Amino acid sequence: MVRALAQGTFDLLHPGHIHYLEEAARMGDELYVIVARSANVTHKRAPVLDGRQRRDMIGALEVVDHALLGHESDIFVPIEEIDPDVIVLGHDQHHDEAAIERALGDRGIDCGVRRASPRDPAYDGELLSTGRIVDRICERRC
Protein backbone atom coordinates (compact mmCIF):
# COMPACT_ATOMS: atom_id res chain seq x y z
CA MET A 1 0.00 0.00 0.00
CA VAL A 2 1.42 3.39 -1.05
CA ARG A 3 1.17 6.05 1.65
CA ALA A 4 0.91 9.64 0.46
CA LEU A 5 1.41 12.52 2.86
CA ALA A 6 0.18 16.08 2.46
CA GLN A 7 0.69 18.89 4.92
CA GLY A 8 -0.36 22.47 5.41
CA THR A 9 -2.14 25.04 7.51
CA PHE A 10 -5.57 24.57 5.88
CA ASP A 11 -7.01 27.70 7.44
CA LEU A 12 -10.40 28.63 6.00
CA LEU A 13 -10.76 25.62 3.74
CA HIS A 14 -11.20 26.52 0.06
CA PRO A 15 -11.25 24.83 -3.39
CA GLY A 16 -7.47 25.14 -3.74
CA HIS A 17 -7.04 22.98 -0.64
CA ILE A 18 -9.49 20.42 -2.01
CA HIS A 19 -7.62 20.28 -5.33
CA TYR A 20 -4.31 19.75 -3.51
CA LEU A 21 -5.67 16.96 -1.32
CA GLU A 22 -7.44 15.21 -4.19
CA GLU A 23 -4.23 15.26 -6.22
CA ALA A 24 -2.20 14.03 -3.24
CA ALA A 25 -4.68 11.19 -2.72
CA ARG A 26 -4.23 10.06 -6.32
CA MET A 27 -0.50 9.64 -5.65
CA GLY A 28 -1.10 6.87 -3.14
CA ASP A 29 -3.55 4.33 -1.77
CA GLU A 30 -3.84 6.02 1.61
CA LEU A 31 -3.67 9.77 2.34
CA TYR A 32 -2.31 11.15 5.58
CA VAL A 33 -2.57 14.89 6.19
CA ILE A 34 -0.52 16.76 8.76
CA VAL A 35 -2.20 20.00 9.81
CA ALA A 36 0.26 22.60 11.09
CA ARG A 37 -0.08 23.71 14.68
CA SER A 38 -0.89 27.40 14.96
CA ALA A 39 2.32 28.08 16.91
CA ASN A 40 4.39 26.63 14.07
CA VAL A 41 2.88 28.85 11.37
CA THR A 42 5.58 31.52 11.22
CA HIS A 43 5.92 32.10 7.46
CA LYS A 44 2.58 33.92 7.19
CA ARG A 45 -0.12 35.40 9.39
CA ALA A 46 -1.40 33.23 12.21
CA PRO A 47 -4.36 30.99 11.37
CA VAL A 48 -7.86 32.24 12.10
CA LEU A 49 -9.05 28.81 13.24
CA ASP A 50 -7.63 26.63 16.00
CA GLY A 51 -5.51 23.67 14.91
CA ARG A 52 -7.96 21.09 16.22
CA GLN A 53 -10.80 22.62 14.22
CA ARG A 54 -8.67 22.71 11.06
CA ARG A 55 -7.63 19.07 11.64
CA ASP A 56 -11.23 17.99 12.17
CA MET A 57 -12.38 19.72 8.98
CA ILE A 58 -9.60 18.08 6.94
CA GLY A 59 -10.33 14.72 8.55
CA ALA A 60 -13.99 14.98 7.53
CA LEU A 61 -13.09 15.10 3.84
CA GLU A 62 -13.79 11.83 2.03
CA VAL A 63 -10.44 11.90 0.24
CA VAL A 64 -8.48 12.01 3.54
CA ASP A 65 -7.81 8.76 5.39
CA HIS A 66 -5.95 10.19 8.40
CA ALA A 67 -5.63 13.78 9.64
CA LEU A 68 -3.38 14.74 12.52
CA LEU A 69 -1.81 17.81 14.05
CA GLY A 70 1.86 18.35 13.45
CA HIS A 71 4.45 17.91 16.18
CA GLU A 72 4.95 20.85 18.51
CA SER A 73 8.69 21.23 17.88
CA ASP A 74 9.92 18.80 15.20
CA ILE A 75 8.08 18.61 11.88
CA PHE A 76 9.75 15.31 11.03
CA VAL A 77 8.41 13.31 14.00
CA PRO A 78 5.00 12.55 12.43
CA ILE A 79 6.69 11.84 9.10
CA GLU A 80 8.87 9.24 10.80
CA GLU A 81 5.79 7.71 12.44
CA ILE A 82 3.74 7.63 9.22
CA ASP A 83 6.64 6.42 7.04
CA PRO A 84 5.15 7.72 3.77
CA ASP A 85 6.20 6.66 0.30
CA VAL A 86 5.64 10.16 -1.09
CA ILE A 87 5.28 13.62 0.40
CA VAL A 88 3.14 15.86 -1.77
CA LEU A 89 3.71 19.59 -1.48
CA GLY A 90 1.13 22.17 -2.46
CA HIS A 91 1.96 24.11 -5.60
CA ASP A 92 2.47 27.35 -3.65
CA GLN A 93 4.00 26.03 -0.44
CA HIS A 94 7.26 27.69 0.52
CA HIS A 95 9.15 24.41 1.02
CA ASP A 96 12.10 23.50 -1.20
CA GLU A 97 11.85 19.92 -2.48
CA ALA A 98 15.62 19.33 -2.56
CA ALA A 99 16.07 20.61 1.00
CA ILE A 100 13.26 18.37 2.24
CA GLU A 101 14.75 15.35 0.45
CA ARG A 102 18.13 16.05 2.09
CA ALA A 103 16.57 16.43 5.54
CA LEU A 104 14.59 13.22 5.06
CA GLY A 105 17.75 11.39 3.96
CA ASP A 106 19.65 12.72 6.98
CA ARG A 107 16.99 11.16 9.19
CA GLY A 108 16.91 7.86 7.30
CA ILE A 109 13.46 8.46 5.81
CA ASP A 110 13.21 7.01 2.31
CA CYS A 111 10.39 8.70 0.42
CA GLY A 112 9.90 10.84 -2.64
CA VAL A 113 8.86 14.47 -2.67
CA ARG A 114 6.50 15.77 -5.36
CA ARG A 115 4.69 19.02 -5.91
CA ALA A 116 0.98 19.22 -6.72
CA SER A 117 -0.22 21.23 -9.68
CA PRO A 118 -1.91 24.62 -9.32
CA ARG A 119 -5.63 25.05 -9.80
CA ASP A 120 -7.05 27.92 -11.78
CA PRO A 121 -10.27 29.57 -10.62
CA ALA A 122 -13.30 27.83 -12.12
CA TYR A 123 -15.21 31.12 -12.44
CA ASP A 124 -14.80 34.86 -11.84
CA GLY A 125 -14.63 35.62 -8.16
CA GLU A 126 -13.67 32.12 -6.97
CA LEU A 127 -11.16 32.58 -4.17
CA LEU A 128 -8.34 30.03 -3.91
CA SER A 129 -6.40 31.61 -1.08
CA THR A 130 -7.10 32.07 2.61
CA GLY A 131 -5.59 35.55 2.44
CA ARG A 132 -7.96 36.53 -0.34
CA ILE A 133 -10.91 35.13 1.60
CA VAL A 134 -9.92 37.20 4.65
CA ASP A 135 -9.53 40.29 2.43
CA ARG A 136 -13.01 39.71 0.99
CA ILE A 137 -14.47 39.33 4.49
CA CYS A 138 -12.87 42.61 5.52
CA GLU A 139 -14.13 44.36 2.38
CA ARG A 140 -17.69 43.23 2.99
CA ARG A 141 -17.98 43.02 6.78
CA CYS A 142 -15.39 45.26 8.45
UniProtKB/Swiss-Prot annotation:
The keyword Nucleus does not apply. It is an enzyme of class 2 (transferase). Homodimer. The lineage of its organism: Archaea, Methanobacteriati, Methanobacteriota, Stenosarchaea group, Halobacteria. It catalyses: FMN + ATP + H(+) = FAD + diphosphate. The keyword Membrane does not apply. ATP binds at residues 9-10, 14-17, 92. This is FAD synthase. The gene is ribL. PANTHER family: FAD SYNTHASE. Pathway: Cofactor biosynthesis; FAD biosynthesis; FAD from FMN: step 1/1.
